[in-house]
Amino acid sequence: MKTIDVKILDPRMQEQMPAYATSGSAGLDLRACIEAPITIKPGETHLIPTGLAIHIGNPAYAAVILPRSGMGHKHGIVLGNLVGLIDSDYQGQLMVSTWNRGQAEFVLNPMERLAQLVIVPVLQVGFNIVDDFDSSERGAGGFGSTGKH
């Protein structure tokens, strides 16, 4: 298993380190490291600290912060930036941009699981400037061009 460096910024995280829930889990839960409950009104966004900083250190990897499916489906709580991208050379605290897209207020409690962190491979590429592309089956067809069903 690949390891990355983590710095615990909030002592409460000593007992709440992210862990894979099952052997098939892709994401590690991130928690809201807040001192008191926060009420997030419909349409509001809040930047929530996680109490952790990571340093991946290897440009062949990055991390993405994704919403937890239950939070979005049941409560309308999703990420304000939709997906958070953490570059391999970032060393600051992981923060979760939290947006209430629902119709009701949501109370976020201290240490509540809020989002998930997924480590992904990255391929850095260069560009080869061309005048034209070799033809492909799809061509330049965009949104909806491959059919409805």
Curated annotation (Swiss-Prot):
Needed cofactors: Mg(2+)
Pathway as given in its UniProt record: Pyrimidine metabolism; dUMP biosynthesis; dUMP from dCTP (dUTP route): step 2/2
Keywords: Hydrolase, Magnesium, Metal-binding, Nucleotide metabolism
Any Pfam family the entry gives: dUTPase
GO biological process: dUMP biosynthetic process; dUTP catabolic process
Keyword Ribonucleoprotein (UniProt): no
Enzyme class: hydrolase
Keyword Hydrolase: yes
Binding-site positions, substrate: R68, S69, G70, N81, L85, I86, D87, M95
EC id: 3.6.1.23
Catalysed reactions listed for this entry: dUTP + H2O = dUMP + diphosphate + H(+)
Superkingdom of the organism of origin: Bacteria
GO molecular function: dUTP diphosphatase activity; magnesium ion binding
Protein family (similarity comment): Belongs to the dUTPase family.
Entries under HAMAP family matching the protein: dUTPase_bact (MF_00116)
Functional summary from the UniProt entry: This enzyme is involved in nucleotide metabolism: it produces dUMP, the immediate precursor of thymidine nucleotides and it decreases the intracellular concentration of dUTP so that uracil cannot be incorporated into DNA.
Protein name, entry field: Deoxyuridine 5'-triphosphate nucleotidohydrolase
Organism in which the protein naturally occurs: Herminiimonas arsenicoxydans
